[in-house]
Amino acid sequence: MDETLLVAGPLDVARTLSRYRAWGEDPANRLTDGAFRRAIRVDGGWRAYELTWSGGPDDAKLRVSVPGARRARVLDATLAEVRRLCGLDLDVASFYRAAAADPVLAALVPRLYGLRPTLVPEPFEMLVGAVCAQQVNLTFAFTVRARLVRRYGTPVRGNGATVYAFPEPAVLARARVGDLRRMQLTVRKGEYIVGVARQIVSGALDLSRLAAGSNEDVVEMLTAIRGLGRWTAEWFLARCLGRGDVCPAGDLAVRKAFAHFYNRGRALSERAIRRRAARWGEHQNLAVHYLLAGQRLHAERAGGGS
């Protein structure tokens, strides 16, 4: 079963999805030249799907293929997930109009035109990924996460390729911390991941409540769990729930980007970053992603990689 999505507003698909291989392999989100593959759970079973695209940022077309799907709800669920992965419901056009008043963002928009933040489809996947990324660089975080996905995820075949479904909470709730340690997760990170999984399985952490809560409610619920700090909670708000008025000001990469673009390389306090970001209102999430992408462009030109 195939479907074509016409995109309203600018979308640079390749740039938007590039994070899925910018720092290494992601077996749950396989990006190759011109194709993206992932697995989705529908009606109690896993389905692999493929996303391909054509056109430029102003006339992008997305083609979604779900082999063997015979029910409309399978395709509907897949299309909804693709919308999240490509950030299609984010108001980029409004952000561009607002960015014109900020010299830094106004200069970045033409260079990054059509970039949209990807939204992680599954809350548990987002939380585990955030724990893996704590206090390490993203290349190492992706390496460790890939090992975890291959060990505990479910291989799903489709479109001539295999993609791994991200491990479910019930599976990681039974994982041994020692086994996670052998994947080069620290003991504490292993404990955090198993702990979050067990909270979800037991019902102590209700993921549906997170989507319905205010920003501060979400921060309060997540930071009450061992191993999840405000940094993790704010990235969850930004990259899973798609909240616009969020700036993960404590994140090291965010702090470096603000220092580079707004303070001649000198560090800014978390409070100062939040104060500046507040000027962008509902566009904070998009602004932060453009600053981070702009910082990576600068590093690449300077020969510093990502």
State where each predicted segment sits:
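HhH-family (HhH-GPD) DNA N-glycosylase catalytic core used in base-excision repair
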Residues: M1-S306
